[in-house]
């Protein structure tokens, strides 16, 4: 399988370049960064592209990839419901093309989101804290936003988080994602970390995941690359490939 990498000079992208090059069943067909023409992907007969670029350019990348029938595995964040709808509309004309967009490719992070969804209905309160390096473009992270949405979905019909706060500085209680407070920390020395806190009378449950190195994303990305052709259309999250429901 011929695989191209977009964002190849970034920290995650460079990790993916090394991972693809080291895989016996994959061939690195192209490695592109800012300013490189996307036509290098078609020139190299690329079948699947790994995209770790920037929210400002990822939609243009996807439009090109879909138009050319190239499968895409996307770790770039910043996706909204409107962006997902746009991707789906592009895919209508290319029914055999696959796009997988995931907020996090670390297997442990995907499992932590799954565990949080399972735990959500058993506790009165839930909050999410995500911690990342200071170069991250979006806040909160895609992982934190998706975690909060999964928690909110699991808590449908239950009372909202108890919170008597009546006065506060703007932002002190975090961002509100479907009723779940999400707090973002940006600190030098961090990579990617998340805590989900659940509380009820007499006990607290903490679900924490830490990516200590960007190689933590490699197994999930390569799994998606190898299996993406099995799932035509848009897939959001790595969960379907891990049989997590």
Curated annotation (Swiss-Prot):
Binding-site residues, NAD(+): 7-12, 75-77, 102-105
Pathway: Amino-acid biosynthesis; L-lysine biosynthesis via DAP pathway; (S)-tetrahydrodipicolinate from L-aspartate: step 4/4
EC number: 1.17.1.8
Binding site for (S)-2,3,4,5-tetrahydrodipicolinate: 133, 142-143
MF (Gene Ontology): 4-hydroxy-tetrahydrodipicolinate reductase; NAD binding; NADP binding; oxidoreductase activity, acting on CH or CH2 groups, NAD or NADP as acceptor
Record-linked Pfam families: DapB_C, DapB_N
GO biological process, one term: lysine biosynthetic process via diaminopimelate
Catalytic reaction(s) noted: (S)-2,3,4,5-tetrahydrodipicolinate + NAD(+) + H2O = (2S,4S)-4-hydroxy-2,3,4,5-tetrahydrodipicolinate + NADH + H(+); (S)-2,3,4,5-tetrahydrodipicolinate + NADP(+) + H2O = (2S,4S)-4-hydroxy-2,3,4,5-tetrahydrodipicolinate + NADPH + H(+)
Keywords recorded for this protein, A-Z: Amino-acid biosynthesis, Cytoplasm, Diaminopimelate biosynthesis, Lysine biosynthesis, NAD, NADP, Oxidoreductase
EC top class, as a word: oxidoreductase
Protein family per UniProt: Belongs to the DapB family.
PANTHER family found in the cross-reference section: 4-HYDROXY-TETRAHYDRODIPICOLINATE REDUCTASE 1, CHLOROPLASTIC-RELATED, DIHYDRODIPICOLINATE REDUCTASE
Function: Catalyzes the conversion of 4-hydroxy-tetrahydrodipicolinate (HTPA) to tetrahydrodipicolinate.
Protein name from the UniProt record: 4-hydroxy-tetrahydrodipicolinate reductase
UniProt source species: Mycobacterium bovis (strain BCG / Pasteur 1173P2)
Primary gene name: dapB
């Amino acid at each position: 399988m011929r695989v191209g990498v977009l964002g190849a000079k970034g920290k995650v992208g460079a990790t993916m370049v090394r991972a693809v090059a080291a895989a016996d069943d994959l061939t690195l067909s192209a490695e592109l960064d800012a300013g490189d023409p996307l036509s290098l992907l078609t020139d190299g007969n690329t079948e699947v592209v790994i995209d770790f670029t920037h929210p400002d350019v990822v939609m243009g990348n996807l439009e090109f990839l879909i138009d050319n029938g190239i499968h895409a595995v996307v770790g770039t964040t910043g996706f909204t419901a409107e962006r997902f709808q746009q991707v789906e509309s592009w895919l209508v004309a290319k029914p055999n093309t696959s796009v997988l967009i995931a907020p996090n490719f670390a297997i442990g992070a995907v499992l932590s989101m799954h565990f949080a969804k399972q735990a959500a209905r058993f506790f009165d309160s839930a909050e999410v804290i995500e911690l990342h390096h200071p170069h991250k473009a979006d806040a909160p992270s895609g992982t934190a936003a998706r975690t909060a949405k999964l928690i909110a979905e699991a808590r449908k019909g239950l009372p909202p988080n108890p919170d008597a706060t009546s006065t506060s500085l703007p932002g002190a209680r975090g961002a509100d994602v479907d009723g779940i407070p999400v707090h973002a920390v940006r600190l030098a020395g961090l990579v990617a970390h998340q805590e989900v806190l659940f509380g009820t009378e007499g006990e607290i449950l903490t679900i924490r995941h830490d990516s200590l190195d960007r190689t933590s994303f490699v197994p999930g990305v390569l799994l998606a690359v190898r299996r993406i052709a099995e799932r035509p259309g848009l897939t959001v999250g790595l969960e379907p490939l891990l049989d997590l429901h």
